[in-house]
């Protein structure tokens, strides 16, 4: 368990162009930021989930219990699609966070690819977090400018839709 007041760690993408910074502030709230080629593209942004009927929620009071880093690199051939090969190359860090007051754990897993960042919340099996309902997600994406975003429309049965900006 961490006994320091705050915690911070950095992870770089395989080509070192993206740099993720993760930290817990003085009250144990998780934050992240992202730099690309030394320029900040996602400013310090809060992570957390508010639970229904839970005064503490999964917002703060965390300590870093464990940090696990790994790298992965594979090329695979899809059965169908526009590309004949898919490169899956990333560096990963998983932070196991503990709320000592509630004896609960979550894992925040980040993957840094040469093309960008992905992350998710994981809920390991535990006695004090068996059944819960997320009331509100407080994950922030503090963009540093008026960036263009691309996405695929959801809830469609086909992969043949244009990207939207």
Protein language model features and the residues they cover:
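Bacterial Sec-dependent N-terminal signal peptides
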Residues: 1-10
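N-terminal accessory beta-strand-rich subdomains and adjacent acidic, glycine-rich linkers
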Residues: 10-165
């Amino acid at each position: 368990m961490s006994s320091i007041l705050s915690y911070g760690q950095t992870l770089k993408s395989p080509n070192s162009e993206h740099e993720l910074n993760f930290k817990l502030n003085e009250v144990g709230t998780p934050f992240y930021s992202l730099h690309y080629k030394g320029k900040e593209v996602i400013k310090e942004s809060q992570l957390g989930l508010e639970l229904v009927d839970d005064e503490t929620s999964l917002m703060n009071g965390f300590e870093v219990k464990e940090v696990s880093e790994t790298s992965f690199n594979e090329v695979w051939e899809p059965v169908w699609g526009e590309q004949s090969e898919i490169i899956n190359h990333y560096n990963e860090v998983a932070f196991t966070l503990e709320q000592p007051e509630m004896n609960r754990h979550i894992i925040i897993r980040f993957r840094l690819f040469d093309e960008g960042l992905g992350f998710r919340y994981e809920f390991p099996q535990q006695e004090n977090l068996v059944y819960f309902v997320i009331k509100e997600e407080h994950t922030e994406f503090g963009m540093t400018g008026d960036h263009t975003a691309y996405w695929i429309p959801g809830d469609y049965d086909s992969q043949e839709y244009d990207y939207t900006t």
